[in-house]
Every structure is written in structure tokens, then in C-alpha cells.
Amino acid sequence: MNVKLLYLLLTALFVGICWVFANTEIKTDSPPLVQREMEDTPFDKMMAVLTHKRCINCHPSDNYPRQGEDSHVHNFGVRRGEDNHGVAALRCESCHQHENNNFSGVPGAPEWSLAPKSMAWQGLTRVEIAKSMLNPENNGGRTLEETVHHLTEHELVLWAWEPGIDANGNPREKPPVPKDEYIKAVKAWAAAGAKIPNE
């Protein structure tokens, strides 16, 4: 078979598969995020960020990352995969690089991936998220100190305050608490014993 013809056929097949994924609506039974009014305590400031779409989009309760200001299921049929970095042909790093791409609107930060399924926060209350976050069985075996480090220094977490622009050139929404205030709140909450208030 002619190599050029084979190349054209494979390209057409790939484009067709991408079109099918892009135009297939994925239905999910995942519950919506439970929101409530923010108060002025360190816990509430921290949770206002952790329950914001910039965090929840990558902490889904199913195998589909979310995207956009409306937190819709990721385009192109992207799925979690065994290592939380997508499946063979649709790895996170195929599109998401180490920084935002202002030409395409694709967001990026180092170590772009979904949180492990044990760290699913979608549909949980703030109290449930905090309990999960402090439970070594759910948080990857982290101590409180390691959890604070992750929440306040990890580049992917801090990306939330530099989320770039979307494909239409519109700025993405940042969390409702400024970064410095959030970091202080996380550290203050931990220093006070990481107490979780009653619901």
C-alpha cells in the first residue's frame, strides 16, 4: 500500500475519533459540590478555596476531570487512567504543559494530573473534605505538616491564582480568597490543631 495513502487514512481515522470524543456527551451521576456562605475563620477561608472550581475540577468523584467555569466533563472523552494522568492516547501532558498556553487557552502547571480517587472532593461538604484531607488512608499517607506543605507550596495547587485564559481569551476565575490570605489561613488552621468544626 502506498505510504502516503496509509498516512492519509490514519490521519482521517484519528481526526474522526477525536471528533466523536469531542461531540459525545458523557453523563455522570456525580453529585454537585455542596456550597455554603464563607465566614472569616481560617478553616472557612481555606475551604472557600478548596471547594472552588479551580480545585474541585481536578478532585472529581468519578473518572472524568472537569473543566471550564461551569465544571463540565472534560472535552474529548478524557478519563482518569490508572495513574491519574489520563489514558494512553489522551495523557494529561499531551495538552497540559508546565505553564498556561495563552495561544490555545489550555491551562498548565508542573505535574498536571487528577487527584487520586481517594482524594475525591466533588459532592462533599467542607467538613467531609477536611476529614478526608487529614485521613492518611485518603491523603496519600501525608502527615499534617506534609498536607500543609502540599496545600501552600505545591505548584499545581498555587496555579489556581494564575489560571490563565480560556480558549476564547477570557480570564479564568480565581478562588475567592487571595493567595497570601489563603496560605496564612491554612497555616493558622493547622497551628491551632487542624480542628474541624461541626456541620
Would you name each region that the model predicts?
Residues 42, 51-54:
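Short N-terminal amphipathic alpha-helix/helix-capping patch enriched in small hydrophobics
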Residues 55-85:
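N-terminal, post-signal-peptide region of Sec/Tat-exported proteins
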Residues 53-62, 89-99, 186:
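The canonical Cys-X-X-Cys-His
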Residues 1-47, 67, 78-83, 101-199:
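N-terminal export/targeting leaders of redox proteins
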Residues 49, 86-89:
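Processing junctions and N-termini across compartments
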